[in-house]
Every structure is written in structure tokens, then in C-alpha cells.
């Protein structure tokens, strides 16, 4: 799977706080989010349906699945490089509800 960092919808306030605190938004608690893996031929219709709903206004296609069954989840960074999206090491930050 190859993700595009620039395509991941992160609120500017969240991005600023993460940058200030040295955190990666992918590894902090986040509620009310959905990652859907759909067939390529259905992607446009699924995205359009999500965007049509008030709660899906920030829906986005953030990547694609590779045909290589041994491929790691990777991300193309904002600078054009690639990095492996690894499991979180250690304990996640607690949710504040």
C-alpha cells in the first residue's frame, strides 16, 4: 500500500500542534475517522458518496494498494521521499474524552 502524506486530511490546528510537540498525526488518538479500502473501479463512486454526506466533507483518496503481496505500507512524504508506515512503538497517547 502506498499512501500520499499530502492527501491525508489533517486539520491545520492538529498539524500545527503535532509539529510543535514533535508528534506524527498518524499515531495520535483520533475518533470518528474511517479508512476504507475499496476496489479501484468503485473508488470514485465511494468517494463521491462520502463527500455528499455532511460528515464526509473531508473524505479523500489517500493512496492505493500495491499488487506486491510482500510490500510494506509506505508513504510518499511531502518532500517526495518514501518511508515505511510502521506500527506504533510503545504506548499510544491516551484519549481525552
Where are the language model's segments positioned?
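Active-site-proximal betaalpha loop/short-helix elements
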Residues: 1-30
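Helix N-cap motif at beta-to-alpha junctions
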Residues: 38-44
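Short amphipathic alpha-helices in soluble, non-transmembrane regions
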Residues: 45-55
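Acidic, Ser/Thr/Pro-rich beta/coil linker or hinge segments at domain junctions
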Residues: 53-97
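Short beta-strand-to-turn element immediately C-terminal to the catalytic PLP-Schiff-base lysine
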Residues: 36-38, 75-76
Amino acid at each position: 500500500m502506498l499512501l500520499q502524506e499530502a492527501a491525508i486530511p489533517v486539520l491545520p490546528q492538529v498539524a500545527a500542534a503535532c509539529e510543535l510537540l514533535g508528534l506524527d498525526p498518524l499515531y495520535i488518538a483520533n475518533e470518528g475517522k474511517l479508512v476504507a479500502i475499496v476496489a479501484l473501479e468503485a473508488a470514485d463512486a465511494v468517494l463521491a458518496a462520502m463527500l455528499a454526506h455532511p460528515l464526509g466533507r473531508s473524505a479523500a483518496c489517500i493512496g492505493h494498494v500495491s499488487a506486491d503481496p510482500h510490500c510494506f505500507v509506505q508513504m510518499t512524504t511531502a518532500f517526495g521521499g518514501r518511508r515505511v508506515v510502521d506500527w506504533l512503538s510503545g504506548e499510544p497517547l491516551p484519549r481525552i474524552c
